[in-house]
Amino acid sequence: ENKWIKKSDIKNIHHYEKNYIKVFKFFLNTKYLWGGKTCVGIDCSALIQIYFYYNRIFFPRDTKDQIRFCKRKRSKNQLKGDIVFWKGHVGICLNKSRFIHAYGPKKKVLIMPTVQTIKLIDKTANLKVKKVSNISNI
């Protein structure tokens, strides 16, 4: 069977993708795989790291190193582009009400309500938010 690639899907090898929402949504429903960093399987820290990789910006691979690397945000309110860190977990706010992460218990990358996600992780994993940074501060 013949398969075709649309010309609009082909990117120059030097292409940068500044639209982080587009990058993260590309992985929506991708299987959660601890240590994975492809569309076959990905974990939470790789999901965040891959945006920076696409833009030729260094960003650590593991959540604990990402926490040390990122600057703390001053505001307590979650906003578009906020990277939320827990011990061993990370995700990003697509806007103030929607949050995307590679979520182990659901076994895939998914979008969830921001506030409910923070409460759910606190309740089910007994984890408090360690740090919030913003993608624009990297």
Name what the model sees in each region.
Residues 24, 47, 81:
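Terminal peptide-recognition signature
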Residues 8-10, 114-124:
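Short alpha-helical interface patches
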Residues 31-78:
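Catalytic cysteine-centered active-site loop
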Residues 1-30:
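Boundary regions of SH3-family modules and the immediately adjacent low-complexity/disordered segments
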Residues 58-116:
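...with weaker cross-activation on analogous glycine-rich loops/strands in unrelated enzymes
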Residues 16-22, 26, 35-37, 54-55, ...:
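Intrinsically disordered, low-complexity proline/serine/threonine-rich regions
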Residues 121-138:
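Low-complexity, Gly/Ser/Thr/Pro-rich intrinsically disordered linker/tail segments
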